[in-house]
Amino acid sequence: SHCATNKRAPGRIWYISRQAKMTTCLPPASRERDGVRANNNDTLMNLHEYQAKALLAEFGIPVPPGKPAFSVNEAMEVADELGGGAWVVKAQIHAGGRGKAGGVKKVIGHSAIEKAADSLLGTRLVTHQTGPGGQPVDRLLIEQPCVVMHEYYLACLVDRALERVVFIASRAGGMDIEEIAARHPDKIIKVVADPIAGLQAYQCREVGFALGLKDKQVTALSRLMLNIFHLFSARDLSLVEINPLAVTSGSDLIALDAKIQVDDNALFRQKALEELHDSSQDDPKEHKAREFGLSYVALDGNIGCMVNGAGLAMATMDLIKLHGGAP
């Protein structure tokens, strides 16, 4: 079942085989090439986690109580407002891998939250998705912690090969999707939404049972997936990724982390989303080029490429690398 070419019926649930190539089934920002992100960012607009969770909450998808903070004092005020004696402090950048890079800290007490906020704000966080220069941290998300019993992976995205909106799910939550695909390809579940009828409740239930959820949790997952599909369609999104989707000690489902990408081509009718764009996360050269309507991707090599298509660009870079160059 090669996910790049398989044209199975939209209503069927199927598993990715161990031999399948996962590239076209992965969320766009997850695909990398020689350490450089290969997604075409000039057609995608990333949101910060706190912005993504606000959208999820708007569409009835459970998220932990939390608020953004732009200074150390504001972080402490948010902690007081949330209450409790423990919090999670999350650096807000447009890249994954924050936890492994020290960008997510669990703290107890006001002195600890002050120290954590001070250590993150004003720095540049380097993860496996940012490149060596990292990305600036000028805002934080302060949340109440949750007691997690199990973590799952759930994403809604456009599969270009199938030309359909698809959902990808896995029991191996909390891991990068590339890692899941490499280590547990048989644990990745995929359902395809019909372009006319949309995602169906029975498909959501099938995913829930495949994940091993209990009856009430299956019902909750169905409601959550249908709400995600509604959000995805109503806001012209390219990706909604929840990793992890957690089962709490009360057997509730909650989105512990969220990533949302918006299709730039739809921003003319999504003005509210356009205003959420944080240009500080853009590469300065890419941002300048975008002002002139140019698609420019900054790389670390010494050979520039001027090409007239994404496919030709990737092939050209492959040839340059093959002959010892650095695009």
Where are the language model's segments positioned?
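Glycine-biased, low-complexity coil/linker segments
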Residues: 32-33
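ATP-dependent carboxylate/acyl-activation modules
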Residues: 44-241, 246-327
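Alpha-helix boundary/capping motif
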Residues: 6-7
